[in-house]
Every structure is written in structure tokens, then in C-alpha cells.
From Swiss-Prot:
<keyword id="KW-0934">Plastid</keyword>
<keyword id="KW-0793">Thylakoid</keyword>
<dbReference type="InterPro" id="IPR005497">
    <property type="entry name" value="Cytochrome_b6-f_cplx_su8"/>
</dbReference>
<keyword id="KW-0249">Electron transport</keyword>
<comment type="subunit">
    <text>The 4 large subunits of the cytochrome b6-f complex are cytochrome b6, subunit IV (17 kDa polypeptide, PetD), cytochrome f and the Rieske protein, while the 4 small subunits are PetG, PetL, PetM and PetN. The complex functions as a dimer.</text>
</comment>
<keyword id="KW-1133">Transmembrane helix</keyword>
<keyword id="KW-0812">Transmembrane</keyword>
<dbReference type="GO" id="GO:0009535">
    <property type="term" value="C:chloroplast thylakoid membrane"/>
</dbReference>
<comment type="similarity">
    <text>Belongs to the PetN family.</text>
</comment>
<keyword id="KW-0813">Transport</keyword>
<dbReference type="GO" id="GO:0009512">
    <property type="term" value="C:cytochrome b6f complex"/>
</dbReference>
<dbReference type="GO" id="GO:0045158">
    <property type="term" value="F:electron transporter, transferring electrons within cytochrome b6/f complex of photosystem II activity"/>
</dbReference>
<keyword id="KW-0602">Photosynthesis</keyword>
<dbReference type="InterPro" id="IPR036143">
    <property type="entry name" value="Cytochr_b6-f_cplx_su8_sf"/>
</dbReference>
<dbReference type="GO" id="GO:0017004">
    <property type="term" value="P:cytochrome complex assembly"/>
</dbReference>
<feature type="transmembrane region" description="Helical">
    <location>
        <begin position="3"/>
        <end position="23"/>
    </location>
</feature>
<dbReference type="Pfam" id="PF03742">
    <property type="entry name" value="PetN"/>
</dbReference>
Amino acid sequence: MDLLSLGWSSLMVMFSFSLALVVWGRNGF
């Protein structure tokens, strides 16, 4: 696994995690 794919996958994980936190925050969870 090269550095580019590793950085891209970690970026997508952080993006999806922050998006989930925003959705949960709006729902009052």
C-alpha cells in the first residue's frame, strides 16, 4: 500500500467521520 492511497483513504475516513458528527449533532444525539 503506497503513501498516496493511504493518505487518500485516511482523508475520506476523516471526512465521513466529521460528516457523521454533524448529522448526529443536528439530530440532537
